[in-house]
């Protein structure tokens, strides 16, 4: 199973086109948040319409897709305090067996087999949410999603990946950046122990001093491709899954290519 991983696209037309053209060469495309750009001169409503069309084009190529929300993906008029957990625009089209949207745990079917995917929404509220009409806390919602992801992994015998925009704090994936959300990410990944977790948010992590694109946190392999400057091809990771504890990950960005392999143990 070949999975293309990235994040922080910020409605960069060049990056979107590159991924659209590359997606058919892979079994699935996963994006860990920040599809929109709140600093762009293009209105956010127009941005989200373009992103949804782009996603549909990827799906029409016959490949699978999943995304989670990032801090750029919420805006007034689409989301209000104490409302749904995820940006409404990201859920305008229902999920299917080949598409997992924000705030879900589902079995994602690909041409080469299944993949358990959990997509954690950005904690825009930092407190209570309304999920399916019921008030709950963000922590309880996340625990519910992770429990469901673990169940899919165990029952289906498939690898499990968690998408969460914020990288785990105190790891090279966040470089020197630290926020309370980063500590929260580290704690939930430590507790859930998925096979992989995909993050973003810190664009420069793979190329800055003390930063890197891959880190093992307990049994979980955490990934952050980082992101390039506007107009450049996107930083990305190609994950080729061959079986439990047998996979290859290749990071490409900033004119460099780095490789990590697991044949029982991780080698970078």
Enumerate the language-model features and the residues they cover.
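Active-site-proximal beta-strand elements of phosphoester/diester hydrolases
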Residues: 2-10, 113-126, 161-165, 220-227, ...
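Short, Asp-centered acidic motifs that coordinate Mg2+ and/or phosphate
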Residues: 3, 27-28, 97, 159-161, ...
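Core catalytic region of metal-dependent phosphoesterases/phosphodiesterases
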Residues: 6, 11-110
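Active-site environment of divalent metal-dependent phosphoester hydrolases
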Residues: 10-17, 36-40, 67-81, 105-107, ...
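Proline-aspartate-enriched helix->loop->beta-strand connector
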Residues: 28, 185, 189-199
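Conserved catalytic scaffold of divalent metal-dependent phosphoesterases
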Residues: 37, 73-184
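A short helix->loop->beta-strand "cap" motif at the edges of active sites that frequently abuts
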Residues: 60-65, 193-195, 217-220
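Binuclear metal-dependent phosphoesterase catalytic core
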Residues: 105-113, 188-191, 205-268
């Amino acid at each position: 199973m070949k999975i293309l991983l990235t994040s922080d696209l910020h409605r960069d037309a060049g990056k979107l086109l590159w991924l659209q053209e590359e997606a058919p060469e892979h079994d699935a495309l996963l994006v860990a948040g920040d599809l929109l750009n709140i600093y762009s001169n293009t209105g956010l409503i127009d941005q989200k319409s373009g992103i949804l069309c782009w996603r549909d084009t990827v799906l029409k190529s016959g490949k699978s897709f999943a995304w989670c929300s990032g801090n750029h993906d919420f805006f007034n008029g689409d989301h209000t305090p104490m409302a749904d957990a995820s940006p409404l625009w990201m859920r305008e089209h229902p999920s299917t067996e080949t598409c997992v949207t924000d705030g879900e745990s589902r079995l994602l079917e690909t041409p080469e087999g299944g993949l358990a995917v959990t997509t954690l929404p950005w904690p825009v509220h930092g407190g209570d949410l309304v999920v399916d009409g019921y008030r709950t806390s963000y922590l309880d919602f996340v625990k519910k999603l992770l429990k469901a992801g673990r169940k899919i992994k165990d029952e289906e015998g498939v690898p499990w990946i968690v998408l969460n925009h914020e990288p785990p704090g105190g790891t090279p994936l966040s470089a020197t950046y630290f926020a309370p959300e980063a500590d929260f990410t580290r704690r939930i990944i430590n507790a859930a122990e998925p096979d992989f977790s995909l993050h973003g948010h810190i664009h420069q992590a793979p190329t800055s001093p003390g930063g890197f694109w891959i880190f093992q946190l307990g049994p979980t392999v955490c990934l952050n491709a980082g992101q390039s400057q506007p107009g450049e091809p996107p930083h990305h990771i190609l994950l080729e899954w061959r079986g439990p504890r047998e996979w290859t990950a290749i990071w490409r960005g900033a004119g460099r290519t780095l490789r990590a392999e697991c044949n029982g143990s991780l080698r970078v």
